[in-house]
C-alpha cells in the first residue's frame, strides 16, 4: 500500500487561458507545464505514487508530458473539477492510501518543502491547506466605487497540494455531489473536517491566463546558473547482433554493439554528460556493469534517471548535443528519430536536442570499423 498518493488534476480546458491548447500543455522552459508538475512529485521520496486526471482528448499530449516518469496510469476526468477529483479519488480505491494530496496540474512550481509540510500536518488533522497571507490592501466595491476596506487579518490565499486522509476526503466528496465548491478544502469544510493551515510558497503560482504563463517564464529565468559537462563512450562491434542501438533507436547493421546493457553508445555518453553537469558521478556509479539487473537493459532508463536527478535538484535541462563517431552505419537517415527519442526520454522539446555524426577519415578504431564512439554535451540550469 502506498502511504501517500498524489492526484494531479489536469482535465481542464483552460477557457480563461484561451486558444486551442490547454494551458497545462504549453511550453515552459523547454518542458510542458504539466511535466514540471508531475516531475516535482514523481521525484519526491515522500510520495508513494502519482496519478493524473486528464481529459479524454488529451492522452497523446499527456503521454508526451509524462514520458520517462514513474506514474500510475491516468484516469479521465468529469464535467467539472470537482467531478474530476472525485473520479480520481475513486480510482485510488485499490491502493487504499493513508493520505492523498490533490494538486492543480497548472501549478508547476510546487516545492518539496510545501509538500512535506502538508504531509506532516495530516498526522495531526484530517486536512491540510497550504496558504500565503494576503499582503495587498483589500477593498469592497459597489457600483464602481470603493464601499469600504476589508480587514485582511486572518485572510489567506489558498494553494495546492491540499492534503487529506484518504478515506475521509472520499466520503466528503461523495456527500457533496451536486454542490459546486471552489476547492477540496471547501469540500472538507462542508463535511466538518478540520483543515490545518500550513505555510505555502509565494512562487507556487497557478497558471490561469497567458499573462500568468509569461510571469512563470520569468520565474524560471530567475536566480540560478547554467552548468555544462561532457560525456564520452565507446563500444566495439558484436557480429552476433544485426542492429546498433543509437540514441534510443535501433539502426540496422551487419553487427551490433557489445556491452553489458544494450550498448547504446549515444545515450551512455549523454547520460554521463547530464550526470556531470550536476556533479552526480558517472553512469558506472549509478548502473555498475557488475550488477546483473542491467544485463541487456535498455539505456533509456539510464538517461531518464539522470534527468530525474536534475529535476530533484529543482533544475532543468537547457539543451543537449550528441556526436556519433563512426564509418558505418550511416546515422543521417535516423538522426531525426534519435533526436525525437532523446527529447522524449528527457521530457524536453525537440529543439533543445542536437544529434550529429562524423567520421575519423579512416583513422583509428572507428576508421577501421571496429566500433562506434560518441561524445555528448549537456547544459543544465540549477537554482542558486
From Swiss-Prot:
Gene3D superfamilies the UniProt entry points to: 2-C-methyl-D-erythritol 2,4-cyclodiphosphate synthase, Spore Coat Polysaccharide Biosynthesis Protein SpsA, Chain A
Stretches for region 2-C-methyl-D-erythritol 2,4-cyclodiphosphate synthase: 227-384
Keyword RNA-binding on entry: no
Catalytic activity reported: 2-C-methyl-D-erythritol 4-phosphate + CTP + H(+) = 4-CDP-2-C-methyl-D-erythritol + diphosphate; 4-CDP-2-C-methyl-D-erythritol 2-phosphate = 2-C-methyl-D-erythritol 2,4-cyclic diphosphate + CMP
Record region (2-C-methyl-D-erythritol 4-phosphate cytidylyltransferase): 1-226
Site (Transition state stabilizer): 16, 23, 260, 359
Residues carrying the site annotation Positions MEP for the nucleophilic attack: 152, 206
Listed pathway(s): Isoprenoid biosynthesis; isopentenyl diphosphate biosynthesis via DXP pathway; isopentenyl diphosphate from 1-deoxy-D-xylulose 5-phosphate: step 2/6; Isoprenoid biosynthesis; isopentenyl diphosphate biosynthesis via DXP pathway; isopentenyl diphosphate from 1-deoxy-D-xylulose 5-phosphate: step 4/6
EC number in record: 2.7.7.60, 4.6.1.12
Keywords recorded for this protein, A-Z: Isoprene biosynthesis, Lyase, Metal-binding, Multifunctional enzyme, Nucleotidyltransferase, Transferase
PROSITE patterns xrefs: ISPD, ISPF
Cofactor: a divalent metal cation
Record-listed a divalent metal cation binding positions: 233, 235, 268
Gene Ontology BP annotations: isopentenyl diphosphate biosynthetic process, methylerythritol 4-phosphate pathway; terpenoid biosynthetic process
SUPFAM superfamilies associated with the record: IpsF-like, Nucleotide-diphospho-sugar transferases
Functional summary from the UniProt entry: Bifunctional enzyme that catalyzes the formation of 4-diphosphocytidyl-2-C-methyl-D-erythritol from CTP and 2-C-methyl-D-erythritol 4-phosphate (MEP) (IspD), and catalyzes the conversion of 4-diphosphocytidyl-2-C-methyl-D-erythritol 2-phosphate (CDP-ME2P) to 2-C-methyl-D-erythritol 2,4-cyclodiphosphate (ME-CPP) with a corresponding release of cytidine 5-monophosphate (CMP) (IspF).
Family: In the N-terminal section; belongs to the IspD/TarI cytidylyltransferase family. IspD subfamily. In the C-terminal section; belongs to the IspF family.
The protein, known as: Bifunctional enzyme IspD/IspF
Amino acid at each position: 500500500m502506498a502511504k501517500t498518493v498524489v492526484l494531479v488534476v489536469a482535465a481542464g480546458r483552460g477557457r480563461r487561458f484561451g486558444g486551442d491548447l490547454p494551458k497545462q500543455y504549453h511550453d515552459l522552459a523547454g518542458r510542458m507545464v504539466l511535466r514540471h508538475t508531475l516531475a516535482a512529485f514523481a521525484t519526491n521520496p515522500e510520495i508513494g505514487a502519482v496519478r493524473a486526471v486528464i481529459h479524454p482528448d488529451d492522452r497523446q499530449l499527456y503521454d508526451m508530458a509524462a514520458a520517462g516518469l514513474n506514474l500510475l496510469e491516468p484516469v479521465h476526468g468529469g464535467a467539472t473539477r470537482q467531478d474530476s477529483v472525485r473520479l480520481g479519488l475513486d480510482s485510488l480505491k485499490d491502493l487504499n492510501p493513508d493520505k492523498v494530496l490533490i494538486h492543480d496540474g497548472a501549478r508547476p512550481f510546487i516545492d518539496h518543502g510545501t509538500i512535506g509540510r502538508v504531509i506532516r500536518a495530516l498526522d495531526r488533522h484530517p486536512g491540510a491547506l497550504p496558504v500565503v497571507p494576503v499582503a495587498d490592501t483589500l477593498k469592497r466595491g459597489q457600483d464602481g466605487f470603493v464601499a469600504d476596506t476589508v480587514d485582511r487579518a486572518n485572510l489567506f490565499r489558498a494553494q495546492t497540494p491540499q492534503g487529506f486522509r484518504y478515506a475521509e476526503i472520499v466520503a466528503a466528496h461523495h456527500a457533496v455531489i451536486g454542490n459546486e465548491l471552489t476547492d477540496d478544502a471547501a469540500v472538507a469544510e462542508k463535511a466538518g473536517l478540520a483543515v490545518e493551515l500550513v505555510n505555502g510558497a509565494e512562487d507556487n503560482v497557478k497558471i490561469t491566463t497567458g499573462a500568468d504563463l509569461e510571469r512563470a517564464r520569468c520565474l524560471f529565468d530567475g536566480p540560478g546558473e547554467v552548468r555544462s559537462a561532457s560525456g564520452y563512450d565507446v563500444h566495439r562491434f558484436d557480429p552476433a547482433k544485426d542492429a546498433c542501438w543509437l540514441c534510443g533507436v535501433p539502426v540496422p547493421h551487419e553487427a551490433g554493439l557489445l556491452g553489458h546493457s544494450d550498448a547504446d553508445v549515444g545515450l551512455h555518453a549523454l547520460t554521463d554528460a547530464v550526470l556531470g553537469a550536476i556533479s552526480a558521478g558517472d553512469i558506472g556509479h549509478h548502473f555498475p556493469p557488475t550488477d546483473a539487473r542491467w544485463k541487456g537493459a535498455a539505456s533509456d532508463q539510464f538517461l531518464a534517471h539522470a534527468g530525474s536527478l536534475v529535476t530533484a535538484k529543482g533544475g532543468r535541462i537547457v539543451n543537449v548535443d550528441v556526436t556519433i563517431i563512426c564509418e558505418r552505419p550511416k546515422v543521417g537517415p535516423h538522426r531525426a528519430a534519435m533526436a525525437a527519442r532523446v527529447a522524449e526520454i528527457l521530457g524536453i522539446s525537440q529543439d533543445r536536442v542536437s544529434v550529429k555524426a562524423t567520421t575519423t577519415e579512416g583513422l583509428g578504431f572507428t576508421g577501421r570499423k571496429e566500433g562506434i564512439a560518441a561524445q555528448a554535451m549537456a547544459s543544465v540550469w540549477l537554482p542558486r
